[in-house]
């Protein structure tokens, strides 16, 4: 029996994780659930899964949740705040942590889980983008297990040699030529370039293949999401930027590929449903039912691939630039993107202003060495303040 903490349980990844948990009550028990402010949804989850602890973002939200839980006769302990997130992520009663809090807010509890030696199901890509070396050092020092949840990185993990994370060898020594990171292209893959400045919020969050939250849906539309995944792949698999190739694949059936020096290319295919990588990571090295139907290749009939157009998707180039610059550059880029995307969702800037704002912030704040978590948070704060001042 694994005891699991789900950071961000009311988001799309959290809901999918609980769906898998519900299918296997003999394998998994929920230790803690967390949400920022979706109190009613969290209370309903507590009623179904009976966690030991529930964490929300504020004292006000905690009071509301406590009233709801008392009305249901539940004994779940209610906590709030950032420190409580780190506590439930590192608690001795917890074996496994689903890190699914969106954005920089997920960094501290993910690091806490790593330092406590937990099995981490990493859906929060910003943790690696902001502090890749720090997180990987914490994992190595504690013996934590890091399992990627992003469909692309989970696919790469499945296509890697079984001994890849057990042997201290370079990708080349494992015979790996490069990683092929697939991308759907989002809702604007074929839209006229001169109309992108007219994109509405509703259009940007309407992803053609995946059901996701608003922020990540916009990131997919700009392909910043894929840029973040390039940086994540670099840290997860130790592959340099020039060996990570992004390929547009509109059908979203091939989730990523690994190319080997003997000419072989291994790919992982499946329906676009996050329960597949979640179930894989939760049960690894076993396999369990995820509730996802297998793909029907005859029905799909055709799989297509193309190179990304960097004029259409300048955020992808910004991410490669940040990875090459190293240091605090990825954290600066990530923070600027979060501010820009929220400004777009709030109707304060246009769609094409997102990449322009990020580029301005990156130019204004040159990269500096990242030595500890406080440095990361300071660079994150500076980038957010700078981005806000440019709006």
Swiss-Prot record:
Which family is this protein grouped under?
Answer: Belongs to the DXR family.
- Which Pfam family name is an example for this entry? DXP_reductoisom
GO BP annotations of the record are: isopentenyl diphosphate biosynthetic process, methylerythritol 4-phosphate pathway involved in terpenoid biosynthetic process
| Enzyme Commission number(s) of this protein | 1.1.1.267
> Which cofactor(s) are needed, names only?
Mg(2+); Mn(2+)
Is Metal-binding among the key words of this record?
A: yes
Q: Which residues bind 1-deoxy-D-xylulose 5-phosphate?
A: 125, 151-152, 184, 207, 220, 225-226, 229
Pathway listed for it is: Isoprenoid biosynthesis; isopentenyl diphosphate biosynthesis via DXP pathway; isopentenyl diphosphate from 1-deoxy-D-xylulose 5-phosphate: step 1/6
Physiological role: Catalyzes the NADPH-dependent rearrangement and reduction of 1-deoxy-D-xylulose-5-phosphate (DXP) to 2-C-methyl-D-erythritol 4-phosphate (MEP).
Q: In its keyword annotation, does this UniProt entry include Thylakoid?
A: no
What is this protein's record name?
1-deoxy-D-xylulose 5-phosphate reductoisomerase
Chain positions recorded as Mn(2+) binding sites: 150, 152, 229
Keywords (alphabetical) are: Isoprene biosynthesis, Manganese, Metal-binding, NADP, Oxidoreductase
The molecular function GO annotations come to: 1-deoxy-D-xylulose-5-phosphate reductoisomerase activity; manganese ion binding; NADPH binding
Q: Which residues bind NADPH?
A: 10-13, 124, 126, 213
State the InterPro entries in the record.
Answer: DXP_reductoisomerase, DXP_reductoisomerase_C, DXP_reductoisomerase_N, DXPR_C, DXPR_C_sf, NAD(P)-bd_dom_sf
Q: What catalytic activity is recorded?
A: 2-C-methyl-D-erythritol 4-phosphate + NADP(+) = 1-deoxy-D-xylulose 5-phosphate + NADPH + H(+)
């Amino acid at each position: 029996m694994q005891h699991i903490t789900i950071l961000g349980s009311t988001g799309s990844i959290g809901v999918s994780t609980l769906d898998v948990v519900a299918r296997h009550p003999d394998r998994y028990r929920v230790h803690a659930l967390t949400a920022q402010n979706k109190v009613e949804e969290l209370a309903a989850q507590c009623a179904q899964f009976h966690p030991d602890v529930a964490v929300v973002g504020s004292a006000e939200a905690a009071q509301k949740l406590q009233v709801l839980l008392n009305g249901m006769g539940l004994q779940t302990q209610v906590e709030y705040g950032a420190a409580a997130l780190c506590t439930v992520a590192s608690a001795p009663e917890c074996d496994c942590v689903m890190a699914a809090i969106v954005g920089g807010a997920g960094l501290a509890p993910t690091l806490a889980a790593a330092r406590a030696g937990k099995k981490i199901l990493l859906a929060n890509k910003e943790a690696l983008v902001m502090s890749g070396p720090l997180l990987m050092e914490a994992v190595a020092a504690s013996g934590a297990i890091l399992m990627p949840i992003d469909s692309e990185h989970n696919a790469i993990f499945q296509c890697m040699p079984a001994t890849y994370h057990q042997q201290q060898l370079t990708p080349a020594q494992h015979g790996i030529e490069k990683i092929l990171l697939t991308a759907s292209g989002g809702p604007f893959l074929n839209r006229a370039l001169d109309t992108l400045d007219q994109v509405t919020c509703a259009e940007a969050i309407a992803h053609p293949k995946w059901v996701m939250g608003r922020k990540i849906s916009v990131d997919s539309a700009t392909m910043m999401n894929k840029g973040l995944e390039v940086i994540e792949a670099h840290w997860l698999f130790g592959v340099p930027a020039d060996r990570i190739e992004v390929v547009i694949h509109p059908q979203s059936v091939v989730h990523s590929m690994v190319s080997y020096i003997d000419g072989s290319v291994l790919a992982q295919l499946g329906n676009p449903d996050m329960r597949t990588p979640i179930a894989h990571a939760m049960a690894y090295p076993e396999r369990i039912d995820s509730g996802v139907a297998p793909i029907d290749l005859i029905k799909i009939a055709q799989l297509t691939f193309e190179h990304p157009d960097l004029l259409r998707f300048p955020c992808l180039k910004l991410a490669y630039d940040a990875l090459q610059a190293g240091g605090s550059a990825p954290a600066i880029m990530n923070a600027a993107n979060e501010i820009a995307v929220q400004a777009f969702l709030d109707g304060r800037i246009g769609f094409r202003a997102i990449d322009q704002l990020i580029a301005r912030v990156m130019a204004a704040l040159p990269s500096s060495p990242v030595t500890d978590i406080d440095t990361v948070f300071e660079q994150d704060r500076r980038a957010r303040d700078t981005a806000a001042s440019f709006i």
